[in-house]
Amino acid sequence: MTKKIDFYFDFISPYSFLAHKKIINSNDRSKFNYKAILLGGLHNLGGITAPAFNERKMKNMKNDCTLIAEKNKIDFIWNDKFPINSLYLMRGYLFINNNKKDKYFDLCFDAYWKNNEDISNEETIKNILTKCEINHNDFETGIKAVSYTHLTLPTST
């Protein structure tokens, strides 16, 4: 049995998006165990000022992500709304049935980092849910029941 690689992601992370696209392009998605994290919480835990709130870091991150996208031929647009609060969408990922997770995941990432959409906007979210054939009211109810403990931080082993 082949061991899966844990892939920690947050929809607001351009690096998560770019890494995910490399995984998709190499047809290796089944080798990865996708785990939702809250990147802002990770920064806070480490006492790190996120690049989004440091002008120099932000400039370097934008340039770095653009270079990575160009090198790997990945459609990528820096989102005008960066950063957003991704808690709602990340909880949604945990709530959604496994057979719809991949589609939800891809649509959220593409909307934000490929199509420059505001994925914190209710209409954008409803559009994503419709494409995934997920009832909006069930989604709303479900994410309220999702525990924060399911949003993980990587641990050293």
Regions found by a protein language model. Give the residues of each.
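Anionic group-transfer/hydrolysis microenvironments
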Residues: 12, 38, 154
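Local sequence-structure signature of Cys/Sec-based thiol-disulfide redox active-site neighborhoods
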Residues: 3-19
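Strongly charged, low-complexity linkers/loops
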Residues: 126-148
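Structural alpha/beta surface segment adjacent to cysteine/selenocysteine redox centers
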Residues: 17-115
